[in-house]
């Protein structure tokens, strides 16, 4: 490690698994020094970071390894800043530069001297990073549990074992599965199937205990803020989903509008057509792919509960799915999008959610409750079967 030049005003840090490449620039924009930081000895790394000028901006890419490095930089009195990896790559390609460790560090150090912050992304504080870690850990456990349940279903399908349980993994269903796994005389399940089923059930029990432990920890450590209470007032949003949304969003105020939050949540429709005279999209509109997939999952998951609850979100779902008869996945995405926009509005205005807000003075629009009542009256007049959105079959005269 080289001796630090005190005239440096900005630094670029290209972080890798075992080392980092550093480029420092002075006030004239010239390179003050370059060096390579080894990550093996953390104490030696901290001592060297302490020699850097305090308060100096250090720019890192928002990719692998930025979290722990930002913590080390903050402890050393430096000012870490995150740059969008996608924008840095586009800038490098526009300048015709080949990708290398030194090139990336040089480009990042140039960003620190620019007054325009087009490249900067939000750096979540430590409490938000901790919240994300807890919620993602629980999500990973639930995902493993779902995968094991699907494998148990596959075992029953392969052996032709049918059941009429609404929830196979409820108390009655688990008793049936336990009997199958322990009954060596049952001819419908071979020995290999019994051993596999028994192992899966043991893993499910272990996962269920782990999920219960982490859920209690989440409720104990995560503070119930006024913002979390407002989110839980939305239809379909419970405590876990509320904390998941807060963990991924961090601060609603960092988004300029509900459209920006929807785009970040991968729910905003966008078109990829050019040269059209109108705003129509012949190839159709699709959601984006650059954002928080966890947020997209959370909003759509809340959309399922909001549709079951009814109200204006059920009205949105029915409008785009013809009463739930076609393209239901698209309907849930639209409801999730509407929930996202509503959450942004109540967070910015710091108000509680109302299912039937009063109409603005002079507005001719009816409230959500009135629209829901009218929808139910229309469905009843059409003699439709409740819960399906489909009409009753016509009566056929016999004889």
Task: Describe the predicted segments one by one.
Residues 317-399:
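Low-complexity, acidic/Ser/Thr- and charged residue-rich accessory regions of DNA metabolism proteins
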Residues 230-233, 239-240, 244-328:
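Phosphate-backbone recognition surface of nucleic-acid-processing proteins
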Residues 134-230:
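Glycine-rich, often acidic, oxyanion-interacting loops/wings at catalytic, nucleic-acid
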Residues 2-26, 108, 141:
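Gly/Thr-rich phosphate-binding beta-strand-loop-beta motif of the actin/hexokinase/Hsp70
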Residues 81-120, 133, 140, 175-176, ...:
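Short alpha-helix plus adjacent loop in nuclease-associated cores
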Residues 114-132, 183-186:
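Short, charge-rich amphipathic alpha-helices with coiled-coil/heptad character
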Residues 19-42:
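Short glycine-rich, Thr/Ser-proximal phosphate-binding strand/loop in the N-terminal lobe
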Residues 40-57:
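Short, basic/hydrophobic alpha-helical segments
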